[in-house]
Design a protein with these regions (language model features):
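Beta-lactam-recognizing serine transpeptidase/beta-lactamase-like catalytic domain environment
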Residues: 1-173
Length: 173
């Protein structure tokens, strides 16, 4: 599917794709709880994406782009949540010894990233990865799930010269 995304990136242009990545939280550290912050990853600057090769690899999620599992999870949550991004958080509040909420952390920031119709199309596509595609091991016995598989090159090789790859899956139920 990389060739599809390379062509899509070329058609949409670097600025639109980069702006969407920013809106999804890529390149920005996530405040998870007081004193606990997730890594920001790396979002290539706009000037670098003027290079067609850089834009091509960025379009399918490689090159200078690095993201964290938390950022990918937040992106998938945005799709599952009808296009509304919700800043991830690990702590809802502080409780006393009796379990009574005594202090609440700030409310999660939310923002609309794309409209509900776009989210429905994306959910359907991601559901097909689980129902009939390579992600079928994630298919639940009841309900609907969706997901995205990925393979990231590391640029590292084992003693036999085989490239070491990172394989991942992110999804929703």
């Amino acid at each position: 599917c990389n060739t599809y995304f390379i062509e899509l990136g070329r058609l949409l242009g670097a600025q639109r794709i980069r702006k969407m990545a920013e809106t999804l939280g890529f390149g920005t550290a996530t405040q998870l709880a007081p004193g606990l912050q997730g890594a920001s990853g790396t979002l290539p600057d706009a000037a670098a994406l003027e290079n067609p090769g850089e834009l091509a690899t960025f379009s399918f999620g490689q090159g200078a782009l690095t993201v964290t599992p938390l950022q990918i999870t937040a992106m998938m949550n945005t799709v599952a949540n009808g296009g509304v991004y919700r800043t991830p958080a690990f702590v809802q509040g502080i409780v006393d010894a009796d379990g009574t909420l005594t202090g609440q952390t700030r409310a999660a920031d939310t923002r609309t990233v794309f409209d509900a119709a776009t989210a429905r199309v994306l959910r359907s596509m991601l559901a097909s990865v689980v129902s009939e595609g390579i992600g079928s091991e994630a298919q639940p016995k009841t309900g609907t799930a969706g997901g995205k598989t990925g393979t990231a090159q590391t640029g590292q090789y084992d003693e036999n010269g085989e490239e070491l790859l990172n394989y991942w899956f992110s999804g929703f139920y």
